[in-house]
């Protein structure tokens, strides 16, 4: 990680080789309501992964009448990628028609990221929170009802896990987690790079 050789969790001193302490989770979540029906949400987080990044990837559905559907080329998904950490920015990944005769396409990326000058003048997230705290502004803080709902969700998952003998696949430090977690993602996109 960052050019250094590091141990995975189970290789650490004072950690049992058969430890089942949760250090990684990957999942496909769905929300059972009208607005989000049929929209999968994928999450992946863990210790000692390839990189520390936080991003939201919106993968657009294919339209039924796609002009470029019947080509020999396998088209990439159209994506909106919102990078939250470490490099704030946004990019739109599209299949664009090549500027030639025919219907061939090529992947293009439209990106925006803050300039180095803007980054230098931007306060850290914690600075904003501390300032809000001093002002008594609770807008950006988690309220009890939100926290309670979050724990209700997490507790339901934890309860299911305790009912089954754990068989967690291990993973090497500096990777994106176990191979099994990558199988959740059904199409190639920047999120797996």
Which residues does each predicted region cover?
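Secretory/organelle targeting and membrane-embedding segments
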Residues: 1-187
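A short, hydrophobic C-terminal helix/tail in secreted or cell-surface proteins
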Residues: 188-193
């Amino acid at each position: 990680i960052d050019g250094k050789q590091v141990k995975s969790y189970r290789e650490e001193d004072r950690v049992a080789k058969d430890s089942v302490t949760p250090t990684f989770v990957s999942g496909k979540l769905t929300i059972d309501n009208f607005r989000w029906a049929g929209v999968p949400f994928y999450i992946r987080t863990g210790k000692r992964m390839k990189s520390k990044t936080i991003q939201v990837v919106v993968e657009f559905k294919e339209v039924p009448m796609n002009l470029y559907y019947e080509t020999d080329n396998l088209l990439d998904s159209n994506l909106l990628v919102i990078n939250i950490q470490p490099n704030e920015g946004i990019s739109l990944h599209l299949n664009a028609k090549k500027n030639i005769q025919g219907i061939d396409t090529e992947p293009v990326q439209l990106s925006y990221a803050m300039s180095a000058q803007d980054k230098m003048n931007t306060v850290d997230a914690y600075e904003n929170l501390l300032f809000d705290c001093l002002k008594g502004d609770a807008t950006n803080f988690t309220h009890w009802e939100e926290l309670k709902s979050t724990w209700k969700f997490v507790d339901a998952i934890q309860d299911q896990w305790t009912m089954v003998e754990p068989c967690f696949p291990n993973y090497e430090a500096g990777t994106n987690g176990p191979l099994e977690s990558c199988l959740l993602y059904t199409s190639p996109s920047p999120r797996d790079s």
